[in-house]
A protein has these predicted regions:
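Transmembrane alpha-helical segments in integral membrane proteins
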Residues: 45-49, 121-145
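Transmembrane alpha-helical segments of multi-pass membrane proteins
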Residues: 8-13, 61-79
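Juxtamembrane "helix-exit" motif on the non-cytosolic side of transmembrane helices
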Residues: 18-29, 52-53, 76-86, 108-110
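Canonical alpha-helical transmembrane segments
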Residues: 39-64
Length: 154
């Protein structure tokens, strides 16, 4: 997979799942089990991409994915820090694509106190990053095991 394709795939999938999982994030009913399933599916996709790219030992994918989700983490943290300022709207628009795909986990954290709601926002872009990194390293480990098996085949 070429770099431009990987970047477009990351952006496209994130926007699709953000659109599918928007219910309750801005307005409307709180997230339900459907939103949770969408979020889990989103994590599974990112894990799978990470695994495949790790098996290929494609370090550029790791760099792109880490940068992509790193920007999401930074945007979300800035939203939390500057939430009382008038520039909040533009910051939320920047972090929205990174938060919305994980909105389904709000189904599990509906009853958090107000102070913990900020933590609820911050973990949303962190989970896909961790899932991608775990997938990548599991794929890389599988690739190394496969190569070791080839050495011992007669």
């Amino acid at each position: 997979m070429r770099s431009a394709q990987a970047i477009l795939l990351m952006i496209f999938s994130t926007l699709i799942f953000a659109w599918l999982n928007i219910g309750g994030l801005v307005d409307g009913p709180p997230p339900d089990i459907w939103n949770l399933l969408l979020s889990l599916m989103f994590l599974l996709i990112w894990y799978s991409w990470g695994f495949i790219q790790g098996k290929k030992q494609n370090r550029s994918y790791l760099l792109y994915a880490s940068t992509f989700w790193g920007l999401g983490i930074i945007a979300t943290i800035l939203c939390v820090i500057f939430s009382g300022l008038s520039m909040l709207t533009s910051l939320w628009l920047l972090s929205f694509p990174f938060i919305a795909p994980m909105n389904g986990f709000g189904f599990l954290t509906r009853d958090l106190t107000e102070n913990l709601r900020y933590l609820n926002l911050i973990y949303k872009p962190v989970l896909p990053l961790l899932t991608t990194l775990i997938g990548y390293y599991m794929g890389k480990k599988k690739s190394n095991v496969d190569r070791q098996d080839e050495k011992f085949d007669l």
